Amino acid sequence: MNVSAIVVEYNPMHNGHLHHIKKTKELTNCDALVCIMSGNFVQRGFPSILDKWTKASIAISNGVDLVIELPTLYSLSSAEFFSFGAVSILDSLNIINSICFGSEIGNINALQDIASTLLEEPLEYKILLKNYLDKGISFAKARNLALVELNRDNKIMSENINKILSLSNNILGIEYLKSLLLLNSSIKPFTITREGADYKDENLHKEYSSASSIRKYLKENKNINILKDFLPLEGFLEFKRLITKGYNFSMEDSMINYIRYKYISGYKNLHNLIDVSEGLDNRIYKSLEKNFTYDSLVGEIKSKRYAYSRIGRILCQYFIGFENYDLNSLLKSTPNYMRVLASNEIGLKVLKKIKRHSSTNIYTKIPKNTNTLLNLDIKATNAYSLLNNNIRFNEDYFRSPIIIKNTIY
C-alpha cells in the first residue's frame, strides 16, 4: 500500500485545500492519504473556527482516508517545531511513503538546497552569517544575505532566495524538509504550487479564497450562501447544518475576556512561555488592561521583533495554561503516540498496517494514564469548550473517532 501524508490546519477547509488533496493523489499515485491536522488551536495563533472532530469529518468527506491530531504543543509552536512535530509523528509510523505540501515556489529542489544548508550550516555559511549579525542586522535578514552570498555562483538561486524566504508556505516547506533530514527519514517529499489568495488576504476571490477571508465573512454575515463557491460542497453543507443547530463558530475575540480575567486574577506567569522574551510579558500585560479585541491587542503588541502570529500563539498558550509545563523538555522529546480523529474504510486498513510496522501507541480513546503531551491536548479542548457551545468540558474523554464508511472520492 502506497501511503502519502499531508500536514493541515483546515481553519476552515476551502477549495485550495481540496486542490491540495487532489494534486497530492495525482503526484504521489498513493493508495491512501493520511492527514495530520492541528486540533482546536492553529499555528497562526487562533482558536479553530470549527472543532477538531468536525474538521476531521469534513476532511474524510473530501478525499482524506485517515485524520490524526497534531498535538497542541506543536500546533501552537513556531514553524520549526510545528513541522518537526508533524514529521516526527509521520516518520514514527513506518508506513508513510511520501509527504506533499504546498509552496509558493513549487520547486522541491530549491527548497531542499536551502533546507540542507540551514540544517548542516557549512563553515562558509556560519562565517557569512556571523559577519552580518556583527553588523547589527536581524537574524532573519542576516540568514537571507548569507544564503544569497553562498549561492553567488548560482544566479537564479541567489536572485530568488529573498523571495523564497519571504513567503510563509515556502518557509514551512523548508522546515518540513529540515525535519526529514534531521530524522534521516525515508519519506519522500513533494511540493505543489500553492493556488489562490495569500493567507492574509481577507477578501473573497473566485474559486480560491483564503481561510482568513472565509472566517472574516462568517464573523460579519449570517447568510452564508455566498460561501458555496469557496468551500467544498460537504463543508458548505456542514456549515449550514451547524448554523441551523445554533453552533458557535469559535472566534479569537471570544478568547480575550477569559485572558483578561486570568491576568487581573493575578496569573502573571507569561515569562514561563518559551516565546516570551524579557520585557514582552510586561508589554502584553499593559496591553491587556486597555484592549478588548484580539486585533487591537495583538496590533498594539506586535513589532518588527514580535510577529503577529507569534503574539497570537502566546495568547493561545496563556489561555490554555502552557506556562505550567516544562515546554523546553517537551519540545526536545519526540511523540510516542498518535491520536485518531476520523477514518474511512481505507484509513482503517492503514491503521492495521501501522499496528504491524510501528511501536507508536495508537489512541482511539483517552487512556487512563495520560502523558504530558496528551494532557496538554485535553487542557486545550477544555479551554476551547469555553468558546464553542458544541464542545463539552472533558469532551476528549467522550469522543471516539468518526468512522465514515463507503466514501467514494
Swiss-Prot record:
Write out the annotated subcellular location.
Answer: Cytoplasm
Tell whether Iron is among the UniProt keywords: no
In terms of superkingdom, the source organism counts as Bacteria
For the keyword Nucleotide-binding, the answer is: yes
Briefly state the protein's biological role.
Answer: Catalyzes the formation of N(4)-acetylcytidine (ac(4)C) at the wobble position of elongator tRNA(Met), using acetate and ATP as substrates. First activates an acetate ion to form acetyladenylate (Ac-AMP) and then transfers the acetyl group to tRNA to form ac(4)C34.
Summarize where ATP binds, as residue positions: 7-20, 102, 169, 194
Catalysed reaction, written as an equation:
cytidine(34) in elongator tRNA(Met) + acetate + ATP = N(4)-acetylcytidine(34) in elongator tRNA(Met) + AMP + diphosphate
Recite the UniProt keywords alphabetically: ATP-binding, Cytoplasm, Ligase, Nucleotide-binding, RNA-binding, tRNA processing, tRNA-binding
Q: What is its EC number?
A: 6.3.4.-
Q: What's one Pfam family here?
A: HIGH_NTase1
What family does the Swiss-Prot or TrEMBL record give for this protein? Answer: Belongs to the TmcAL family.
Q: Name one GO biological process term.
A: tRNA modification
- The protein in question is named tRNA(Met) cytidine acetate ligase
Which PANTHER family does the entry mention? TRNA(MET) CYTIDINE ACETATE LIGASE
* GO CC, alphabetical: cytoplasm
